[in-house]
Amino acid sequence: MGLPANLYIDEEDKQTMIFAYPNLFTDASSLQVIRLEIGALAAWTPAELVDIVPYAAEQYPQLFKQKAVSVLTVSPERTFWEKATILHHEANRPEHLSMPQRYSRHYYDLYCMAKSPVKDKAFARLDLLQKVVNFKIKFYPRAWARYPEAVPATIKLLPPLYRLDTLQEDYTSMQNMLYGEIPSFKTMMETVEELEEEIHAL
């Protein structure tokens, strides 16, 4: 759009860089900025180089001299266990504490990974689950999250029943952020339940 980049440090979280990008419309279901969490409290191992092709380059290849860019990113096996421990955290959230907005994305992300080869790769790296748990206990301690119970035999992915209505509303409000074939809330949660059972059997 010919506008300068608007980059700044988040005042509430000094380890996060904010990129406020030009937009043609707003949507209450999504953040209107990109958050780059690049501080010391972000775990980067294991990591790998991945080629990313923007959607714009796929749709208008004639406009791009370079369609792909290599990005160093955390391996999907670690992301799988990061997401699983987020769900464990939410399963143990006290009833008087509200679940943050847009948290249904974590259930959707884990649903997608459970349907991909990432699941088996993550299952083969249970050491990463322990590393994620240790990291969160050290840097994000919350007694009620019960991180020591986030081991294969006792990890919890499903939220309490009283959270489901709110979670479903959140998921419905986020539909504009999702691409392709979008699973129903029921299908997504059934897959998460099956995944929890699979992990318990490891």
Language model segments and positions:
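Structured mid-to-C-terminal alpha-helical surface segments
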Residues: 1-202
